[in-house]
């Protein structure tokens, strides 16, 4: 595989930092970080460029908080300036390079893919190959983001990149928190990269026809239940080499009996339905919106 260099200057260019600033602020124009940054925007970008060029950039302190929907998770948030701008600047340059390494079977946080593309592909497989999709192997990884090993991730980055200064910067960002922190813009790409060679192994060496991955949520379809059980043993070993552990609730089951619970839907050969939890969340949010609307109307009529 050809390794790519001469990227650091592209990341550090003032034009790229300005573009990153424009991207990072989308949907956040009224937030404190953007408002403060805009008071001295040009000076800040020049300062960021200087710290990158002289090698003195260090990741800022994280603001860590917990969310409870759809499940309890710790979220790590960095300041808008300089960190979020820098992460976008890095991805302006690296996104096409990294995405080129992904197989067509992974869907999380990739432009023109996502949940709907994953759902479409699962439906297509079930419709076009009912015999070859009789059984499903469903698995996910225990505490995937916190379990990502820094040394393994760094070695994966070096399979595609050879720019020493850029790799040094990426190493600093990686080492700024345990695992890969949920909430960082770069984290979703690091997570996809961490499993991209596993994807290639599944498709190119194991010759799995029906394989779908969304983050660490994995679905494999086949006609033979015993084959899927055997493959699961190999998957567990491969992921173990990546310092990852499969959750104990993995299952092999007939699709006709219970459907495939994946990306918010439950898929059968003949139909698809929305997951119950998604329906409940939607109904709760709709009820809140209707309640606000009624209050607003009552206030207006007074």
Residue ranges and their predicted role:
Residues 93-97, 197, 201, 238:
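Active-site catalytic microenvironments for nucleophilic, acid-base chemistry
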Residues 2, 79, 88, 226-230, ...:
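Right-hand nucleic-acid polymerase module
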Residues 51-52, 105, 120-215, 219-234, ...:
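Conserved polymerase palm-domain catalytic core
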Residues 34, 181, 185, 266:
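Gly/Ser/Thr-rich beta-alpha loop segments that engage phosphate groups in nucleotides
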Residues 1-153, 161-162, 178:
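Conserved two-metal-ion catalytic palm core of "right-hand" nucleic acid polymerases
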Residues 236-244:
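A common structural junction motif
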Residues 100, 204-210, 243-246:
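Surface-exposed helix-capping loop/turn segments at secondary-structure junctions
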Residues 60-62, 212-216, 249:
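Short Gly/Ser/Thr- and Asp/Glu-enriched loop/turn motifs at secondary-structure junctions
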């Amino acid at each position: 595989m050809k390794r790519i260099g001469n990227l650091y200057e592209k990341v550090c260019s003032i034009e790229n930092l300005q573009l990153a600033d424009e991207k990072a602020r989308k949907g956040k124009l009224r937030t404190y970080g953007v408002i403060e940054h805009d008071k001295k925007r040009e000076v800040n970008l020049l300062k960021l460029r200087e710290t990158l060029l002289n090698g003195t950039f260090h990741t800022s302190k994280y603001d860590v908080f917990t969310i409870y929907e759809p499940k309890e998770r710790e979220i790590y948030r960095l300041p808008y300036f300089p960190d979020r701008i820098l992460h976008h600047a890095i991805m302006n340059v690296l996104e096409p390079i990294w995405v080129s390494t992904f197989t067509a079977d992974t869907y999380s946080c990739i432009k023109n893919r996502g949940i709907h593309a994953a759902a479409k592909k699962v439906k297509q497989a079930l419709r076009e190959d009912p015999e070859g999709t009789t059984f499903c192997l469903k698995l996910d990884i225990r505490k995937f983001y916190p379990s990502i090993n820094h040394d393994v991730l760094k070695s994966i980055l070096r399979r595609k990149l050879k720019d020493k200064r850029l790799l040094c910067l990426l190493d600093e960002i990686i080492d700024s928190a345990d695992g890969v922190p949920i909430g960082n813009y770069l984290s979703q790409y690091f997570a996809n990269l961490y499993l991209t060679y596993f994807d290639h192994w599944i498709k190119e060496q194991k010759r799995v026809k029906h394989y779908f991955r969304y983050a660490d949520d994995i679905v494999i379809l086949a006609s033979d239940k015993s084959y899927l059980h055997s493959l699961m043993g190999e998957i567990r070993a491969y992921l173990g080499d990546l310092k990852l552990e499969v959750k104990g609730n993995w299952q092999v089951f007939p699709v006709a009996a219970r459907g495939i619970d994946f990306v918010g839907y439950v898929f059968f050969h003949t139909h698809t339905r929305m997951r119950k939890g998604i329906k409940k969340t939607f109904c709760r949010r709709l009820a809140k919106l209707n309640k606000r609307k009624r209050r607003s109307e009552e206030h207006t009529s007074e």
